[in-house]
């Protein structure tokens, strides 16, 4: 057992000892299936507090020859698979956490030498005959050991991207680190001495001239998780089970912490779910993850459409984003799409592969991003807040003329980014118009199923505001009339869809006439 070579299972045991542990050992079935193949080079990126280190510790405990982990894994899901013991504790494992190494190394400029020297020293204690003293290259050392013994290594790097994020301006350090990783993993020889390479961090592998610096790796990210989706965060079924176990309101947990969509799998923030299960406090835990301060300068970058996109998402809508050009680093931001893509990797935004659009996943993140805009007192945000406040007040006062006028103004403000041509474009303007409502209401429910169709929008007030703010049931029409919209709400019994909600309800019909370019609104109490 060493610091980097063949660690024991104690780190993973600490995770198992926690009050709440969700079994993700099914991932090992996949890694076992690709061992000693060209598919065994894996990079899994995900946000902070999404279980990166626990996964790395689990793989170490399973494969490391430095421990006996049979009892540990015999009660986990992996033990239900055939031949689960075949690879258990059978490999020399090299595992290091780049973030931890920064301090003892004395800074990022010394990191590669620190990792290399310490790993070589530990390898010599195991393979003194195979590893001459004059060998100073880690890839060469692994190749020599493999040539003499035919043994392959499992290499696990936690927080692989620390230098990419924290030393982003120093190209010399970046180049040295990337070259170290290339020497370790790229080419024919690494396929001989590596049984499994597993990198984990926040960012995917950095691109060099549009190509991945390690293009032999299979990447599983917040943009494209594929088979890793159920191992990134907590799944909905896992959260339901935990809520039953800890007697928590699942629907409330869902509103606050759900929202990540990975391969049609609903994924929750594990850190937040664990905290609310333990303490029953529904609040944002995100600012404690260490990335919050990084987003304030990001969303204030001077890119066309960036602030508009953030405001649109804060209002409950999604925005299209081109994720293909982001270089997976901290310095090559060239457009709003690069910024939004980075925010997806950080976990501040969700991503829908089917529509190629970004959105704010849940109430927790909506609060954090709203706070970030306030830090810089956005003129755009303050103007929209004022207009939206007036719109919401007018709606609550049943002032239909003012509601129509305010929607008209917001429509005019957004003509550069939203072209009116159908009810969908009208709905985009409506979500922006109701930005102010997010203080008092949950994210609007789009097309809520009812007995005879779908309600266009439903705004449910947060519990603490239900005595002052009614639920809003909104129907939109295009080239019809507000009367038609209101009648549809009644005829199709949309109100029944709000059961078992108890509280006041406003029925809102809004129409846009393309010829007159006017909005019309009618409001009734249910």
Where are the model-predicted features located?
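Phosphate-binding site recognition
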Residues: 1-422, 437-441, 445
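Active-site metal-binding core of divalent-cation-utilizing nuclease and nuclease-like domains
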Residues: 144-149, 438-468
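Structural motif
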Residues: 154, 470-474, 506
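Mg2+/Mn2+-dependent nuclease catalytic core
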Residues: 174-180, 478-495
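Metal-dependent nuclease catalytic cores in nucleic-acid-processing enzymes
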Residues: 184-191, 341-349, 431-436, 488-508
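Extended hydrophobic-aromatic, low-complexity segments
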Residues: 352, 441-447, 465-471, 482-485, ...
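Conserved catalytic cores of phosphodiester-cleaving nucleases, focusing on short active-site segments
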Residues: 430, 455-461, 469-480, 492
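Domain-level recognition of nuclease-like catalytic cores that cleave nucleotide substrates
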Residues: 497, 503-526
